[in-house]
């Protein structure tokens, strides 16, 4: 025999009320999504209608700065360098490299930082390679001994074709706090190139134009039906060459949408004359220690839809033509032998 539980009259009334409420369409709320400020205002009004009356004032979680879309926080690096090794006129956005001598007794707490201009200076190239950079490098860094005091083995590393092993790309410069003896250098090691101030300011990547080329324009792809890549990558290449029978290093920056294997293949063709000249000059002295031709390293990327701009860096009566990339994102890689 089945028994039926008797439902109290109060519970029956509550059930009836719930069933009736389900038939009533839910209350709609108007939200302005055109601007972040309007969205925050409407959300505050809705929450205020349902919040307990004991809460006074606005709901702080829905402030305008909370509604505003965030930016991607870059990773900054700070370095303490000798003032004479980094010129005050080095522009914000110039890509810098940290030189490391290892963990031996010669290692100090003061860092050694190279910009493209100062690195060109210590590589020992002539004016034929990059006339504008050559001229400004001898003005900014008149005395080469300032670098040799903090990086005494640079010449030896170039001769042994191993300079790239001690160079680490540390990103574009965003701040240079100067003093009499030591400077504090801040760079974007990884991420969007933004200033370390509030609000953040976008900083362009700045490179000497006579040290830069577009690989895709120099050696374009054959026509194909492949889709256009959304990014182009920026690289630095160090080539170990012989200049007047003296070991030197050639420095070049370039951008391309090609893959890593295509980049290495093209560089071997692009520098074929310099490579052949080195082998000819060395002759019987060519061995495994100086057989390394060069190395290439990725620095970051930008949109393939953007085109690098042109600029000029003026110093006294001289100017340095530059290439500027407004949407550069720092993402340094490791060195790959050519």
Swiss-Prot record:
Coiled coil: none annotated. The keyword Ligase does not apply. Interacts with TRX2, MCP and capsid vertex component 2/CVC2. This is Triplex capsid protein 1. InterPro entries: Herpes_1. Belongs to the herpesviridae TRX1 protein family. The keyword Transmembrane helix does not apply. Its main location: virion. It comes from the Viruses. One of its GO terms (biological process) is viral capsid assembly.
